[in-house]
Design a protein with these regions (language model features):
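Conserved catalytic/coupling modules of large nucleotide/cofactor-utilizing molecular machines
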Residues: 1-143
Length: 143
């Protein structure tokens, strides 16, 4: 609450996604990833992004060794923005495979390597890229 008004809400959403991922892992072990609904596949991808992009930290990288609260907050917002945009695209009929292949996912993952003095500008850039790629995806699929 000292960092941002929505910190606890974002944190709780991420924790929920990780818990749901653990439950879905049991299904995947029994019948495979293809048995999951597109929404559940997106949930698995979002949880993977939380684990790999947000929670994983490289202690030997000069920028990633220390992560400010502002950067953590922005990273939470980016991961969840991708998840929300993906859910919206699915509701509009987009294909899950196209959603998870959006190039912006790599940019979200690289955000943790952003220098502190460039956080705001890079956050805006990635947010605009997510909006543009999602709009293009929906336009391309005629949705």
């Amino acid at each position: 609450e000292n960092v941002a008004n929505d910190w606890m809400k974002l944190r709780q959403r991420m924790m929920t996604l990780l818990q749901e991922e653990a439950e879905l892992e049991e299904i995947v072990k029994m019948v495979g990833m293809d048995a999951l609904s597109p929404g559940d596949r997106l949930k698995m991808e979002a949880a993977r992004s939380i684990r790999e992009d947000f929670l994983h930290q490289n202690s030997f990288h000069e920028i990633d060794t220390y992560t400010s609260l502002e950067k953590q907050h922005n990273m939470m917002r980016l991961v969840l923005a991708f998840y929300d945009a993906g859910l919206d695209a699915l509701k509009q009929g987009a294909d899950i495979n196209d959603i998870v292949k959006l190039p912006v996912r790599e940019q979200i993952g690289r955000y943790k390597y952003t220098k502190e003095d460039q956080l705001a500008a890079e956050y805006e850039k990635v947010t605009r890229q997510l909006a543009a790629e999602t709009a293009e995806l929906l336009g391309k699929e005629g949705l």
